[in-house]
Amino acid sequence: LSKLDVENGLRETFMEDNGSYTYKMVPMENNVWTQSFFTGIVAYMYYHYREQKYLDFLYGLFGYYEKNLYSHLEEIDHDAGFIHSLYAVAAYKITGDVKFQRMALKAADELGKRHHYESGVIASFCSLKDSKINMIADDVMNLQLIIWAHSETNHPFYERVYKKHAQAVINYIIRE
């Protein structure tokens, strides 16, 4: 991991038509939730090695993540908790820079708006106006962003959302 090259984008796996897998470098501008694995690793690399190139990379992505968040507010879905925990929250924790904190809190606010009060879940893909609210296993990743937001603000909104969502995860996702 110490040889991770942060200048060439992210290596993504693609399945070809013949069933074989290939690996290609893709730019960070491609809006894919899996890129947050990469930013999370880069944040960890900076935390562990304290090499400036990792911090520069995280700061260099700020505009991309900011644009992606604010230009797609109506499209926020279950990936938001994962994406922003591994980018904005991680960057805030290692830098203390409030611009990362603000971004993470905005993502938590938008994710919290997807909370369906009656069912207790943070809806995955559907509109909250739908008669059926969906939930998938990936929704567990939303908990860390909402719990973090509560720990930062102590706001009862976040506490209510994460407690109801956690109970919904226990009720609907976890099996014996």
Task: Report residues per predicted region.
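Glycan-recognition and catalytic cores of secretory/periplasmic carbohydrate-active enzymes
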Residues: L1-E176
